[in-house]
A protein has these predicted regions:
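Short acidic alpha-helix initiation/capping motifs at coil-to-helix transition points
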Residues: 24-25, 41-46, 76-81, 126-135
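Iron-sulfur (Fe-S) cluster-binding segments and ferredoxin-like electron-carrier domains
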Residues: 42-44, 81-99
Length: 167
Protein backbone atom coordinates (compact mmCIF):
# COMPACT_ATOMS: atom_id res chain seq x y z
CA UNK A 1 0.00 0.00 0.00
CA UNK A 2 2.75 2.39 -0.92
CA UNK A 3 0.09 4.85 -2.05
CA UNK A 4 -0.39 5.87 1.58
CA UNK A 5 1.45 8.77 3.14
CA UNK A 6 4.95 7.94 4.31
CA UNK A 7 5.18 10.07 7.43
CA UNK A 8 8.18 11.85 8.85
CA UNK A 9 8.58 13.12 12.40
CA UNK A 10 7.07 16.41 11.26
CA UNK A 11 3.99 14.93 9.53
CA UNK A 12 3.21 11.94 11.77
CA UNK A 13 0.05 11.98 13.88
CA UNK A 14 0.80 13.11 17.44
CA UNK A 15 0.18 9.63 18.86
CA UNK A 16 2.82 8.15 16.53
CA UNK A 17 5.49 10.82 17.02
CA UNK A 18 7.24 9.31 20.06
CA UNK A 19 7.63 5.98 18.28
CA UNK A 20 8.75 7.47 14.98
CA UNK A 21 11.21 9.77 16.80
CA UNK A 22 12.69 6.74 18.59
CA UNK A 23 13.14 4.92 15.27
CA UNK A 24 14.90 7.96 13.81
CA UNK A 25 17.15 8.24 16.87
CA UNK A 26 18.05 4.52 16.85
CA UNK A 27 18.47 4.05 13.08
CA UNK A 28 19.37 7.48 11.79
CA UNK A 29 16.47 7.25 9.33
CA UNK A 30 12.80 6.27 9.20
CA UNK A 31 12.12 3.17 7.09
CA UNK A 32 9.16 3.58 4.74
CA UNK A 33 7.27 0.80 6.54
CA UNK A 34 7.43 2.79 9.79
CA UNK A 35 6.37 5.96 8.00
CA UNK A 36 3.34 4.23 6.51
CA UNK A 37 2.40 2.47 9.75
CA UNK A 38 2.44 5.89 11.46
CA UNK A 39 -0.84 6.60 9.63
CA UNK A 40 -2.40 4.36 12.29
CA UNK A 41 -0.48 4.84 15.55
CA UNK A 42 -1.96 1.63 16.98
CA UNK A 43 -0.70 -0.33 13.96
CA UNK A 44 2.77 1.12 14.47
CA UNK A 45 2.65 0.17 18.16
CA UNK A 46 1.41 -3.32 17.25
CA UNK A 47 4.22 -3.80 14.75
CA UNK A 48 6.91 -2.65 17.17
CA UNK A 49 5.65 -4.56 20.20
CA UNK A 50 4.89 -7.80 18.35
CA UNK A 51 8.23 -7.44 16.58
CA UNK A 52 9.99 -7.39 19.96
CA UNK A 53 8.03 -10.44 21.11
CA UNK A 54 8.72 -12.27 17.86
CA UNK A 55 12.44 -11.59 18.20
CA UNK A 56 12.39 -12.93 21.77
CA UNK A 57 10.50 -16.15 21.06
CA UNK A 58 11.96 -19.65 21.40
CA UNK A 59 12.79 -20.05 17.70
CA UNK A 60 16.37 -19.31 16.71
CA UNK A 61 17.06 -16.11 14.79
CA UNK A 62 17.56 -18.22 11.67
CA UNK A 63 14.24 -19.99 12.18
CA UNK A 64 12.49 -16.63 12.62
CA UNK A 65 13.97 -15.54 9.28
CA UNK A 66 12.76 -18.73 7.57
CA UNK A 67 9.21 -17.88 8.70
CA UNK A 68 9.61 -14.25 7.60
CA UNK A 69 11.06 -15.07 4.17
CA UNK A 70 8.43 -17.72 3.46
CA UNK A 71 5.61 -15.42 4.55
CA UNK A 72 6.96 -12.54 2.46
CA UNK A 73 7.42 -14.78 -0.57
CA UNK A 74 3.93 -16.27 -0.17
CA UNK A 75 2.45 -12.78 0.21
CA UNK A 76 4.44 -11.61 -2.83
CA UNK A 77 6.27 -8.82 -1.02
CA UNK A 78 9.55 -8.63 -2.90
CA UNK A 79 10.78 -5.80 -0.69
CA UNK A 80 10.35 -7.91 2.46
CA UNK A 81 11.89 -11.00 0.83
CA UNK A 82 14.93 -8.91 -0.08
CA UNK A 83 15.17 -7.33 3.36
CA UNK A 84 14.96 -10.60 5.27
CA UNK A 85 17.34 -12.28 2.82
CA UNK A 86 19.88 -9.52 3.40
CA UNK A 87 19.48 -9.78 7.18
CA UNK A 88 19.86 -13.57 7.16
CA UNK A 89 22.91 -13.29 4.90
CA UNK A 90 24.69 -10.46 6.73
CA UNK A 91 24.16 -12.03 10.15
CA UNK A 92 24.96 -15.50 8.81
CA UNK A 93 21.73 -16.86 10.29
CA UNK A 94 21.13 -19.36 7.50
CA UNK A 95 23.21 -21.18 4.92
CA UNK A 96 23.11 -19.98 1.35
CA UNK A 97 21.18 -23.13 0.41
CA UNK A 98 18.57 -22.55 3.13
CA UNK A 99 18.06 -18.95 2.04
CA UNK A 100 17.69 -20.08 -1.57
CA UNK A 101 15.17 -22.76 -0.54
CA UNK A 102 13.11 -20.31 1.55
CA UNK A 103 13.06 -17.76 -1.28
CA UNK A 104 11.92 -20.45 -3.72
CA UNK A 105 9.27 -21.86 -1.34
CA UNK A 106 11.08 -25.17 -1.79
CA UNK A 107 10.89 -26.77 1.65
CA UNK A 108 12.47 -29.98 0.37
CA UNK A 109 15.62 -28.15 -0.71
CA UNK A 110 16.84 -27.00 2.71
CA UNK A 111 20.18 -28.42 3.81
CA UNK A 112 18.78 -28.88 7.32
CA UNK A 113 15.89 -31.30 7.98
CA UNK A 114 14.55 -29.28 10.91
CA UNK A 115 14.43 -26.07 8.86
CA UNK A 116 12.75 -28.02 6.08
CA UNK A 117 10.03 -29.09 8.53
CA UNK A 118 9.66 -25.49 9.72
CA UNK A 119 9.33 -24.29 6.13
CA UNK A 120 6.75 -26.95 5.32
CA UNK A 121 4.75 -26.10 8.45
CA UNK A 122 4.91 -22.34 7.77
CA UNK A 123 3.68 -22.87 4.22
CA UNK A 124 0.83 -25.05 5.54
CA UNK A 125 -0.13 -22.43 8.13
CA UNK A 126 -0.34 -19.81 5.41
CA UNK A 127 -2.07 -21.95 2.79
CA UNK A 128 -4.65 -23.26 5.25
CA UNK A 129 -5.03 -20.08 7.30
CA UNK A 130 -3.86 -21.92 10.40
CA UNK A 131 -6.03 -25.01 9.96
CA UNK A 132 -3.12 -27.41 9.46
CA UNK A 133 -3.81 -31.13 9.36
CA UNK A 134 -2.93 -33.54 12.15
CA UNK A 135 -0.23 -35.01 9.92
CA UNK A 136 1.31 -31.58 9.25
CA UNK A 137 1.36 -30.77 12.95
CA UNK A 138 2.81 -34.20 13.79
CA UNK A 139 5.59 -33.76 11.21
CA UNK A 140 6.43 -30.39 12.77
CA UNK A 141 6.59 -31.94 16.23
CA UNK A 142 8.53 -34.97 14.96
CA UNK A 143 11.20 -32.57 13.65
CA UNK A 144 11.81 -31.36 17.20
CA UNK A 145 9.44 -28.44 17.50
CA UNK A 146 6.78 -28.04 20.20
CA UNK A 147 3.37 -26.48 20.77
CA UNK A 148 4.85 -23.15 21.83
CA UNK A 149 6.80 -22.96 18.60
CA UNK A 150 3.73 -23.85 16.53
CA UNK A 151 2.01 -20.78 17.97
CA UNK A 152 5.18 -18.72 17.47
CA UNK A 153 5.13 -19.60 13.77
CA UNK A 154 1.57 -18.26 13.59
CA UNK A 155 2.71 -15.09 15.41
CA UNK A 156 5.55 -14.67 12.91
CA UNK A 157 3.18 -15.14 9.99
CA UNK A 158 0.82 -12.53 11.46
CA UNK A 159 3.63 -10.02 11.90
CA UNK A 160 4.99 -10.68 8.42
CA UNK A 161 1.55 -10.37 6.87
CA UNK A 162 1.05 -6.91 8.39
CA UNK A 163 4.40 -5.79 7.00
CA UNK A 164 3.88 -7.46 3.62
CA UNK A 165 0.45 -5.93 3.13
CA UNK A 166 1.51 -2.44 4.21
CA UNK A 167 4.66 -2.49 2.08
Amino acid sequence: MSRLTIHTVETAPEAAKPRIEAVLKNNGFIPNLIGVLANAPEALAFYQEVGKLNAANSLTDGEVEVVQIIAARTNECGFCVAGHTKLATLKKLLSEQSIKAARALAAGEFDDAKLSALATFTQAVMAKKGAVSDDELKAFFDAGYNQQQAVEVVMGVALATLCNYVN
